[in-house]
Amino acid sequence: MSVFVIKLLAIVSMLIDHLGCYLRYRLLISADVYSVMRSVGRFAFPVYAFLIVNGYRKTHDVKRYLTRLIAFAAISQVPYALFHNMYYTLPDEGLMIELGTRWFVCLIFVIVAGVAWFTAVRADWSVIWPVLALTLAVLRVEYRGVMILGEELNVFYTLALGLAVIAVLDAATREERDYVKLLMQAIALFGAGFLIMDNADYGLLGVALIVAIWIARDSVFSQAGILALWCVVKFLIYGNGMSRFIGGICCLIPVFLYNGKLGKPLKLGFYAIYPVHLAILGALVVYHKFV
């Protein structure tokens, strides 16, 4: 099973999950059908975590890979908030903009990034994406009862932080180490984690899974064991039912069937499906709830 096929399975799982949320919100499906669709969706994140580690091992440009994840974290945040309007009833007021309680951490990032950009020998425009993503993470924007930006953060924040952590850990284990650079990266990771971990989709549990899979990267059986243990821990913590546990544990199938081949490249399409489908579902939620 190639990376292409595994990605398609994860995407289909995610789409079924989110579609189930919308259809149940509209009372178009029964509670049993909703439970099945949500259970299918539990397959997606552990597979994404596996793909992040696999992508890190195969990429020739970690910075570009990380920047892409951060960029889509920023791009996806408004669609993600619109989609989650189905869970909120907000007062029908005018424009409201608030800063989260940890906005000062974001301000530090913006200042440091600005100084780094202006003092660089060659301007690096990729710094815009982490600044934008972290700024959106601390903003809450509502307009006439519609949440445009909320406190909950989309899964790209978790995936990006997980990738950044394993990149720093990998650099720290090499023979040639730049300790000053590693210290700065560690501080940046701590700040980003402090800023987003409480609100990001899957949060600390998701980042921990990515790191654990990377540590076990040389053994498919160890990776499978970690994924199984993660599903058990998640089941014990949240207790969402056996069907969702089974949906999650099915992630072991592509891990064992992975043949190491890339397959047909999806390029940016793999990432774009996430904000596009959330934007469509979010628009439908807003339309049916407020129009």
Q: Which sequence ranges carry the predicted segments?
A:
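Alpha-helical transmembrane segments and their immediate juxtamembrane cytosolic regions
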Residues: 1-291
